[in-house]
Amino acid sequence: MTDLVVTGRGSAPVADLISSLTRDVADFPKPGIQFKDLTPLFADREAMAAVIDALADIAAGTDLVAGIESRGSLVAAALAARLGTGVLSIRKSGKLPPPVLTEEYDREYGAASMEIPADSLELRGRSVMIIDDVLATGGTLGAATRLLKRTGARVTGAAVVVELTALRGREAIAPLRVHSLSRA
């Protein structure tokens, strides 16, 4: 397990900033799910900068940052700009023109699939860090890893803003190295 004690806003650890600016929404998108709304975090200039700085320390030296749609892509784009790398958005099914590579997965509240372009990118041998907002069951990170490995990319790890430890997603995607900025 990778722990970070990164500071922002004076000396507050980034995990405290994330926790203070995350809104819990009960029964969304369906009953029994506790949704982590990171909108207040992303809208706060200083907190978002602290998150990106922490992720930049983790992803330094990577060739490409891959963000999982939609909130993971938002974070990945900011991170790629900070690192001076390219960014790849791993999209929800049906959002890209063909041909695409598709990977199916199960998530906390149903099955889904994700896609990347099949022929417009050369990823073979490139080091890629996957970025997502929340690690829950590990379904999306696992699928993203499988999808990128099919292209020949070298997935160096993943980083998430929030990890929901009770759902044991980290165990589901082992041995993928996962960095969490905060845990709930």
UniProtKB/Swiss-Prot annotation:
HAMAP family per UniProt: Aden_phosphoribosyltr (MF_00004)
User: What superkingdom does the record give?
Assistant: Bacteria
Reaction it catalyzes: AMP + diphosphate = 5-phospho-alpha-D-ribose 1-diphosphate + adenine
A Pfam family that the UniProt record links to this protein = Pribosyltran
Gene3D superfamilies with a match to the protein in the record = 3.40.50.2020
Extract one GO BP annotation from the record. Answer: AMP salvage
Q: What molecular function terms (GO) are annotated for this protein?
A: adenine binding; adenine phosphoribosyltransferase activity; AMP binding
Where found, per UniProt?
Answer: Cytoplasm
Q: What does this protein do?
A: Catalyzes a salvage reaction resulting in the formation of AMP, that is energically less costly than de novo synthesis.
- The answer to whether the entry has keyword Transferase is yes
Q: Part of which pathway?
A: Purine metabolism; AMP biosynthesis via salvage pathway; AMP from adenine: step 1/1
Instruction: List keywords of the entry alphabetically.
Output: Cytoplasm, Glycosyltransferase, Purine salvage, Transferase
Keyword Glycosyltransferase in record? yes
Q: Describe, as the record does, how this protein assembles with itself and its partners.
A: Homodimer.
Question: Family assignment?
Answer: Belongs to the purine/pyrimidine phosphoribosyltransferase family.
Q: GO terms for CC?
A: cytoplasm
| EC numbers on record | 2.4.2.7
> InterPro entries from the entry?
Ade_phspho_trans (IPR005764), PRibTrfase_dom (IPR000836), PRTase-like (IPR029057), UPRTase/APRTase (IPR050054)
**Top-tier EC class:** transferase
Q: What is its main location?
A: cytoplasm
Name recorded for this polypeptide: Adenine phosphoribosyltransferase
